[in-house]
Amino acid sequence: MNLLPVPVAALPPVVLGVELTIDLNEGLRRSLRTAFGMKTRAINLRIDPSMDLIFLCEKTLPGTLPCLAALTRPGVIAVTLREAHLAWQPDPEHPIGRGTSTLAALESGSCFLTANSRKIAIASFSERNIHPTHVTMEMLGRPNLLEYLRSDWFTLEISGTNRRRLTRPLAFSAVLEFDLQLNPEAAEA
């Protein structure tokens, strides 16, 4: 007997929101000089200046988050990403103006989930998806993410490149919406 999953529209989406911050770029050259006592000339020869524009934000989360409780119900056979976006979190001490870090400082990036020593790219964005207050990400296929999100701990990572160096930390929320699919027998019960 071949079982078909319940249509996606039958269940409300599961929404995961995670606050992240891209810290102020100290400058790779300066941090290496401070940490290792290297001379500036040696550093200039070995480090590409564009490395200062690479960012990585990650947060390790428990699989027991209340927003993920629907994943533990009987009969859930698949979880797929429906939508993903980044939302800017303005710094109340620094109103929008010159020198304010917004999402427009980003150039491109990807979103990954990691659990049980396995990592999967689930969404990405490029210049055309970026606005000062939000970034719409494009899904990278529709892989089943159930085992990632049901694990004891999983890591959400956003990484990519900036257009320019940040003058202040950049705070934002990564918001992921997931569709659940149920085994038809469990849906009827």
Regions found by a protein language model. Give the residues of each.
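Beta-strand elements of well-folded, non-transmembrane domains
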Residues: 22-26, 83-92, 113-119, 160-166, ...
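Cysteine-clustered segments with highest specificity for TGF-beta superfamily mature ligands
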Residues: 123-182
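Short amphipathic, basic-aromatic surface patches that mediate peripheral association
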Residues: 67-69, 89-99
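Short, surface-exposed beta-strand/strand-loop-strand elements in extracellular ectodomains
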Residues: 94-118
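N-terminal leader/pro-regions and domain N-caps
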Residues: 1-49
